């Protein structure tokens, strides 16, 4: 079984929507009065579909054909108004619409190649919306503590393992493995990640026309510290 096909098939089992995520999104949409959202790196559409349930018009995009296919099937099954299509966050030129908000959640942003591409991507985001919500792993903690392994995720059907390999060029190899309980089959894959520290992210946001309006360490809205599991940032486009 191909790793990324397996990951897309079991993504919702591995990463189910949790109460704090749902509440955070609802509060954010209400506070910023969003009526439309572009969800970049939407995965299997979990956040996009939840956002559409609030009455917001949502387009979810992802680089994975499998993820987009699953998202469309989920939306159709439950009658969601969310729509989905293929797109790479590095090139949003085919998306002609503008939105109130842009979401880039689930550590999608860390797939840029470095500072230059980060700046290019955040600049593109500013052409698509006036409000921005970002979420990544807290790489300040990962780098400071040289964290090499994230907690494994165990479900009724599988165990999901995640390890980091620190590279000399400052990037991370993110090594993932899924072990299926019944068949004992194991599939694995590796992604190259740019570990974006929070100061770098905030500096680049400012350089690309964004003003940070909120920062948290998780979707429970706990204050961000170097020990936080995640970095969640909200920003507003600075009027020109």
Predicted regions located by residue number:
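SAM-dependent methyltransferase
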Residues: 133-204
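Conserved class I S-adenosyl-L-methionine
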Residues: 1-32, 34-43
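Class I SAM-dependent methyltransferase SAM/SAH-binding core
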Residues: 45-91
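Short conserved loop adjoining the S-adenosyl-L-methionine
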Residues: 91-97
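A short SAM/SAH-binding and catalytic strip from SAM-dependent methyltransferases
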Residues: 100-116
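A short glycine-rich, Lys/Arg-flanked "PGG" loop and its adjoining helix->strand segment in the class I
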Residues: 117-131
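C-terminal lobe and adjacent flexible extensions of AdoMet/dcAdoMet transferase-like proteins
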Residues: 200-240
């Amino acid at each position: 079984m191909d790793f990324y096909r397996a990951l897309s098939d079991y993504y919702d089992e591995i990463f189910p929507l949790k109460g704090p995520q749902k509440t955070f999104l609802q509060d954010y949409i209400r506070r910023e009065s969003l009526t439309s959202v572009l969800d970049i790196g939407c995965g299997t559409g979990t956040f996009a579909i939840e956002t559409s349930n609030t009455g917001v018009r949502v387009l979810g995009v992802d680089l994975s054909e499998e993820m987009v296919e699953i998202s469309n099937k989920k939306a159709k099954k439950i009658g969601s108004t969310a729509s989905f299509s293929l797109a790479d966050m590095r090139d949003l030129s085919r998306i002609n619409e503008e939105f109130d908000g842009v979401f880039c959640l689930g550590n999608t942003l860390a797939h840029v190649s470095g500072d230059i591409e980060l700046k290019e991507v955040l600049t593109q985001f500013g052409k698509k919306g006036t409000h921005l919500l970002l979420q990544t792993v807290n790489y300040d903690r990962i780098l400071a503590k040289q964290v090499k392994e994230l907690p494994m995720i165990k479900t009724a059907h599988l165990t999901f393992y995640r390890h980091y390999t620190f590279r000399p060029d400052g990037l991370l190899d993110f090594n993932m493995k899924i072990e299926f309980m019944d068949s004992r089959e194991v599939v694995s894959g590796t992604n190259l990640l740019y570990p974006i520290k929070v100061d770098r992210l905030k500096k680049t946001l400012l350089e690309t026309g964004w003003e940070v309006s909120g920062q948290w360490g998780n979707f429970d809205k706990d204050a961000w510290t170097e020990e936080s599991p995640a970095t969640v940032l909200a920003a507003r486009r600075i009027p020109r």
